Curated annotation (Swiss-Prot):
Gene that this polypeptide is encoded by: rpsH
Protein name, as recorded: Small ribosomal subunit protein uS8
Quaternary context: Part of the 30S ribosomal subunit. Contacts proteins S5 and S12.
NCBIfam families: PRK00136.1
Family: Belongs to the universal ribosomal protein uS8 family.
GO molecular function: rRNA binding; structural constituent of ribosome
Functional note: One of the primary rRNA binding proteins, it binds directly to 16S rRNA central domain where it helps coordinate assembly of the platform of the 30S subunit.
One GO BP annotation of this record: translation
Keywords noted in UniProt: Ribonucleoprotein, Ribosomal protein, RNA-binding, rRNA-binding
InterPro entries assigned: Ribosomal_uS8, Ribosomal_uS8_CS, Ribosomal_uS8_sf
Organism whose genome encodes this protein: Finegoldia magna (strain ATCC 29328 / DSM 20472 / WAL 2508) (Peptostreptococcus magnus)
Short name of one Pfam family: Ribosomal_S8
Length: 131
């Protein structure tokens, strides 16, 4: 039994990037699809698609690298964990590396980046940092 599926997804992405893989597969869920969509919108991955396998489905993520095979995702870190939840008010939403990275925040309007949360004046649970 997996206790933290989001941390598992982030670890799979981190390991695949460090091993220079082109794609990585993770078990699907709605929150993982939202995280993948944010990573795509922010330019950290090339794309993703969801395939049905008769159970929960699989998300295949196409990883992105620079022209000389340098990593686009240099770091990805889980912040709010099942044993220690981390919440931030609208005025406390953190900036990652002075704005170079993103924080993914779970709000009442779904998963959004730190920039969107600050702009709309909403806080929530800080899921992870990506830089």
């Amino acid at each position: 039994m997996m206790t933290d599926p989001i941390a598992d997804m982030l670890t799979r992405i981190r390991n695949a990037v460090n091993a220079k893989h082109k794609v990585v597969e993770v078990p699907a869920s709605n929150i993982k699809k939202s995280i993948a969509q944010i990573l795509l919108d922010e330019g950290f991955i090339d794309g993703f698609n969801v395939t049905e396998d008769g159970k929960q489905g699989i998300i295949t993520i196409d990883l992105k690298y620079g022209p000389n095979e340098e990593k686009v995702i240099s770091g990805i870190k889980r912040i709010s964990k099942p044993g220690l939840r981390v919440y931030a008010r609208a005025n406390e939403v953190p900036k990652v590396l002075g704005g170079l990275g993103i924080a993914i925040v779970s709000t009442s309007k779904g998963l959004v980046t730190d920039k969107v949360a600050r702009k709309e004046g909403i806080g929530g649970e800080v899921i992870c940092y990506v830089w």
